[in-house]
Amino acid sequence: MGQCVTKCKNPSSTLGSKNGDREPSNKSHSRRGAGHREEQVPPCGKPGGDILVNGTKKAEAATEACQLPTSSGDAGRESKSNAEESSLQRLEELFRRYKDEREDAILEEGMERFCNDLCVDPTEFRVLLLAWKFQAATMCKFTRKEFFDGCKAISADSIDGICARFPSLLTEAKQEDKFKDLYRFTFQFGLDSEEGQRSLHREIAIALWKLVFTQNNPPVLDQWLNFLTENPSGIKGISRDTWNMFLNFTQVIGPDLSNYSEDEAWPSLFDTFVEWEMERRKREGEGRGALSSGPEGLCPEEQT
């Protein structure tokens, strides 16, 4: 920032003579006479004669030359800079309120206090949205960069400001492209990056699937989660490919699974799931049939 200071300079040359700023000759002096006064250029901003300079009156040219440029642009930039500086100070104070004593980051204990001040549960969907906007690399942790960049991304520098953004974040997450980005982020967010994990633990994956589909629960989700829960020995982890493809699965496969084809390029775990679910439904149907028919195949009304 800075102010532009200009100075008005009066022209030093005299007008009315071809000699310009040359020393006038004796012949010129004798012709003009001893009492002749050299014509002076009027100071900036004062009216003068009608002498033209490139088609403009000399007085007008001088006035235009000494006009100062408008400072509205500089003032606007200065005001914006001051506002940004104040916002950074508020963010610094907010970050320090929750950051760990030893590490320059908000860790589990600070995260609990942060969520408590936001009046949200650490395990609820709005916190996942916040982590998404902060592009947090690890659960239960916000680094300084993540916190500052995230707050700037949602234009908030206070607890009240963050709370005020939740409705718009919930609406944004309903957009198909935004939800896809959130969904893919959630897988990475669930990994333990410090351990170099490449797949989600089954229990973590189940919890995150329930969480990320909070606003849009596909019909097949409950069946899928039941399959994962009841087959713990056969499913050790969920790969990134399986996680990403499950979103496509929910969008193209109907709840009755009738349009699923093993010939398509689905993960093998989906083949196992569909086979397991169809067998479960068959057994369930047979059980209902047996109950309705009673002993020896007689209907209940025929047993009396």
Curated annotation (Swiss-Prot):
Coiled coil: none
Major site of localization recorded for this protein: membrane
Highest taxon of source: Eukaryota
Ranges of residues in domain DCUN1: 86-278
Keyword Membrane: yes
Expression sites (tissue/organ): Tends to be down-regulated in different type of cancers, including lung neuroendocrine carcinoma, thyroid Huerthle cell carcinoma and lung squamous cell carcinoma. Mostly expressed in testis and brain. Highly expressed in liver, bladder and renal normal tissue than their tumor tissue counterparts. Palmitoylation stabilizes DCUN1D3 at the cell membrane.
Annotated consequence of substituting residue 2 to S: In a cancer; uncertain significance
Record's keyword annotation contains Nucleus: yes
Subcellular localization, as worded in the UniProt entry: Cell membrane; Cytoplasm; Nucleus; Cytoplasm, Perinuclear region
InterPro entries: DCN-prot, DCN1-like_PONY, PONY_dom
Induction: Increases by UVC treatment.
Segments of this protein annotated with the region Disordered: 1-86, 284-304
Keywords: Cell membrane, Cytoplasm, Lipoprotein, Membrane, Myristate, Nucleus, Palmitate
Positions of N-myristoyl glycine lipidation: 2
GO biological process: negative regulation of cell growth; negative regulation of G1/S transition of mitotic cell cycle; negative regulation of protein neddylation; positive regulation of apoptotic process; positive regulation of protein neddylation; protein neddylation; regulation of cell cycle process; regulation of protein neddylation
A molecular function (GO) term: ubiquitin-like protein binding
GO CC terms in record: cytoplasm; cytosol; nucleoplasm; nucleus; perinuclear region of cytoplasm; plasma membrane; ubiquitin ligase complex
Effect of residue 2 to A: No effect on CAND1-, CUL1-, CUL3- and RBX1-binding. Loss of localization at the cell membrane. Loss of function of inhibition of DCUN1D1-mediated CUL1 neddylation. Loss of myristoylation. Loss of myristoylation. Loss of myristoylation
PANTHER family assigned: DCN1-LIKE PROTEIN 3, RP42 RELATED
Subunit structure: Part of a complex containing DCUN1D3, CUL3 and RBX1. Interacts (via the DCUN1 domain) with the unneddylated cullins: interacts with CUL1, CUL2, CUL3, CUL4A, CUL4B and CUL5; these interactions promote the cullin neddylation and the identity of the cullin dictates the affinity of the interaction. Interacts preferentially with CUL3; this interaction triggers the relocalization of CUL3 to the cell membrane where CUL3 is neddylated. Interacts (via DCUN1 domain) with RBX1.
Cited function: Contributes to the neddylation of all cullins by transferring NEDD8 from N-terminally acetylated NEDD8-conjugating E2s enzyme to different cullin C-terminal domain-RBX complexes and may play a role in the cell cycle progression by regulating the SCF ubiquitin E3 ligase complex, after UV damage. At the cell membrane, can promote and as well inhibit cullins neddylation.
Protein name per the record: DCN1-like protein 3
